[in-house]
Amino acid sequence: MTSVPTAVHDEQHAEAQAAPPITMFGPDFPFAYDDYLAHPAGLGHIPATEHGTEVAVIGGGLSGIVTAYELMKTGLRPVLYEADRIGGRLRTVTFDGCSAEGEEGALTAEMGAMRFPPSSTAFQHYVDLAGLTTKPFPNPLAPDTPSTVVDLKGETHYARTLDDLPEVYTQVMHAWNACLEEGADFSGMQRALRERDIPRIREIWSRLVEKLDNQTFYGFLCDSPAFKSFRHREIFGQVGFGTGGWDTDFPNSILEILRVVYTGADDDHRGIVGGSQQLPLRLWEHEPQKTVHWPHGTSLAALHPGGEPRPAVTRLHRTAGNRVTVTDATGDIRTYRAAVFTAQSWMLLSKIDCDDALFPIDHWTAIERTHYMESSKLFVPVDRPFWLDPAVDEKGEPTGRDTMSMTLTDRMTRGTYLLDNGPDRPAVICLSYTWCDDSLKWLPLDAGERMEVMLKSLGEIYPKVDIRKHIIGNPVTVSWENEPYFMGAFKANLPGHYRYQRRLFTHFMQDRLPADRRGLFLAGDDISWTALRRPPGKAIRTRAGRARRRGRPGPGPRAG
């Protein structure tokens, strides 16, 4: 909640306002994906003799869809395989008993990714391409969030700004900023990212990787004099910065957290109006204005019989001529000169029968060592945004507060988000959004049981508020660790894992691999340095691994 940009010194803030914006330009792989995407020459060139060649794309999440879309534009024929539904962790659902899916004004719940930072300019490129609109997401203490309640150890505090909270929260904010400046050259790295100063980015980051690769997030805090107080560390873990508490990330590598704060990945979030799953679905149907080989009006859907992707992949193996042979759930067997795997990488260890020859042994080790975060959510539809009603005291006098607020707590629910669709219109509450151990607490319970526990927990914070009477449909819930094609919400490296992540990330540079280990490319969340907000970048790199660039450097040269 104590977001870093609100805590910089005044002179730094003034300087930042006048400087170029922060984007996800690094720090691990400083490359201007936004400029690359905007180049009129496109992303690369495929020889005419290769036009129409089929390329398997396994996984229909955003990375897979972007990969297929860009391959199609160069004249190749992507063949998409998807085990469940297009969208991956961009999963938007409707509620039973409410307006039907596709109906104007239908209530939706974002079961996966639901908020995106402006700094993810490659992601925004495709949002704009798909004609989608965004709106501010109601994070704790965000400018467009009406109010926030922090409930810790039975003490409840109401706030519209940070200044409304007790002084200890400001102390925690200052401690976090001091920790970043002293231990991670925060302002220096942000300045380099704004200026896209590649030598300076590499200088700072290389030093930090050497120093901090074996350090946990919690250890980084403990090493800082600013966080010598356990109480400050405890509050920081429960309340955090940007989107809320971060104690579930305490065991992870501090390098993961630095990527988030350096690049503004947790700041100024926006949600997609109508749901994030529209993005991959619209790209599936989108007809590019400029394509090679294919006639005008060609889309990914048009290249697939019945407009549907092929089913789940059940086997991957290499065959003569260094081809990749794919078997799907119907028993159909097809062989390709190249394939791109964008699904959750543990699928290669469990759901899909794979040859060891698909990857070098060190890459298999990196896949096996991938670490995933558990995550659970539950949403309910309500009749209207009743939380904006003025609260009253025992005498019926207005208190000056909202009836209910975006809520951060150390209770079972942890994070509660209020999603407003306008005055007197049906709305949605995310009763609980949890991670890791907090998520596992919900795993044995079904949606109804979860809702009952959540309503009881929130009733202890808001004893005068009857949430139940406003609910107009059945709850929807997800535990990503229990989803058979995901087994977790997203990748988060543990200390010492930098070498594994670099190995997977640079896999697209296949001229470095033995000749008999080429042709199968890795992409997606698990391969990117960061989470869902950057899979378009990994898809672009994979696409560049297949194409030749007309005299301008693509992602490949940067990997050196």
Can you name each region flagged by the protein language model?
Residues 72-98:
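Glycine-rich FAD pyrophosphate-binding loop
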Residues 7-10, 15, 24-26, 128-129, ...:
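Mobile amphipathic helical/loop "lid" adjacent to a hydrophobic cofactor/ligand pocket
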Residues 195-312, 319-321, 345-347, 352:
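Active-site/ligand-binding neighborhood in enzyme catalytic cores
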Residues 2-42, 323, 381, 388-560:
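Conserved flavin/dinucleotide-binding core of flavoenzymes
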Residues 50-80:
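N-terminal Rossmann-like FAD-binding beta1-loop-alpha1 element of flavoenzymes
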Residues 338-362:
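Flavin (primarily FAD) binding-site architecture
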Residues 310-334:
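Conserved beta-strand-loop-beta-strand element in the redox core of flavoprotein oxidoreductases
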Residues 51-53, 329-338:
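Core beta-strand elements of the Rossmann-like FAD/NAD(P) dinucleotide-binding domain
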